[in-house]
Amino acid sequence: MVFFRSVSAFTRLRSRVQGQQSSLSNSVRWIQMQSSTDLDLKSQLQELIPEQQDRLKKLKSEHGKVQLGNITVDMVIGGMRGMTGLLWETSLLDPEEGIRFRGLSIPECQKVLPTAQSGAEPLPEGLLWLLLTGKVPSKEQVEALSKDLANRAAVPDYVYNAIDALPSTAHPMTQFASGVMALQVQSEFQKAYENGIHKSKFWEPTYEDCLNLIARVPVVAAYVYRRMYKNGDSIPSDKSLDYGANFSHMLGFDDEKVKELMRLYITIHSDHEGGNVSAHTGHLVGSALSDPYLSFAAALNGLAGPLHGLANQEVLLWIKSVVEECGEDISKEQLKEYVWKTLNSGKVIPGYGHGVLRNTDPRYVCQREFALKHLPDDPLFQLVSKLYEVVPPVLTELGKVKNPWPNVDAHSGVLLNHYGLTEARYYTVLFGVSRSLGICSQLIWDRALGLALERPKSVTMDWLEAHCKKASSA
């Protein structure tokens, strides 16, 4: 296994990523050919849904009994790792290459998705269009969607009142999830279901709920931030700004580089196929025909767990603990000793390893590229770079880690901290805003395809022991 031990190794990594960006894959060219000039996203879906329904029906009728793999005891007791059991259209995670959004890698998305006029990072609205339609949108389509979201972003006062009923010291994710639950009062799906809407039309009020939810979560999230850290001095939405820039503005950061970072952050955190806790939770709750607000609030509660979205908070806190104990100019040898000290105390190195990935997370790579471009001399970024060289060999030597490489959480906190968003407890809320794009996109397709109530079979240890005994004697 090759480790990144020097600056030249980092340079090779950058060259590899830039090489990926310089040439479009066949999938990118195909999607570009499929793009339409229609500016209305919903009408695009109305055209796509019947053919995808027929495709799923054919798949089920012709191949419904085809086996996808074997289930082992390890899978059952190990969190269903590696068990294929979900249909998730918007993205697919490859252990070696990382995430692909509708077939596109992150470098490809950076190449083909529209950007802000003065920016270089993909607009989240463009990714949302891609996730929902499988097509690369035009600049005009993204502008139309951006305006639609801006017009949907009004949040009722009772949502703020619900948040204000909580102590200002409550965790940001508690306040955020409570705000999303309060938004549920306006659910179009719930009203339509109570009025007897036909199941073939379920996707339409789901679409309205999801677009409204995506539009409003940045407003709620920004309110939580300003309430907790800026004396409750909230900043109103600016309809002239794109999704990422407006979120940055409402948080109180109007620097163009912060807006660019927010566009990148939302895009790369938006979706990571369907098996992770937040995505799976959203799908699971939605399969009961709970409306998108209920489903997404449940997903946020899963995201708040230390083993999922809370990890980005823990990374920055751990990095700062390194600085406090060893100083910013820590040598690689000292850093190696600190890493071993952390591991020997029974803790993990936050931001390293992944349940599926077996290489460096491409979401880490693109954040590193952003840092090299905009903040190469930042002390914490330089420490993150040293960790990239030190940690993988240590974890490999430890011998208990399938993936010793950094994931997305290993970098995001340092970027946010550099621009003044230093409140690490809040970082998971940013993750939650981003994840609304992927979870809501899939919820729309769940209802459009008529996917069933999720109901896997569970077993007891007695059953497993009896089954294994029978299998061994056969």
From Swiss-Prot:
One of its GO terms (biological process) is citrate metabolic process. GO terms for cellular component: chloroplast; cytosol; mitochondrial matrix; mitochondrion; plant-type cell wall. This is Citrate synthase 4, mitochondrial. InterPro entries: Citrate_synth-like_lrg_a-sub (IPR016142), Citrate_synth-like_sm_a-sub (IPR016143), Citrate_synthase (IPR002020), Citrate_synthase_AS (IPR019810), Citrate_synthase_euk (IPR010109), Citrate_synthase_sf (IPR036969). It catalyses: oxaloacetate + acetyl-CoA + H2O = citrate + CoA + H(+). Homodimer. Belongs to the citrate synthase family. Keywords: Mitochondrion, Transferase, Transit peptide, Tricarboxylic acid cycle. Its main location: mitochondrion. Residues 1-16 form a transit peptide. It is an enzyme of class 2 (transferase). Citrate synthase is found in nearly all cells capable of oxidative metabolism. Pathway: Carbohydrate metabolism; tricarboxylic acid cycle; isocitrate from oxaloacetate: step 1/2. It is found in: Mitochondrion matrix. It comes from Arabidopsis thaliana (Mouse-ear cress). Its EC number is 2.3.3.16. One of its GO terms (molecular function) is ATP binding. The active site is at H308, H354, D409. The lineage of its organism: Eukaryota, Viridiplantae, Streptophyta, Embryophyta, Tracheophyta.
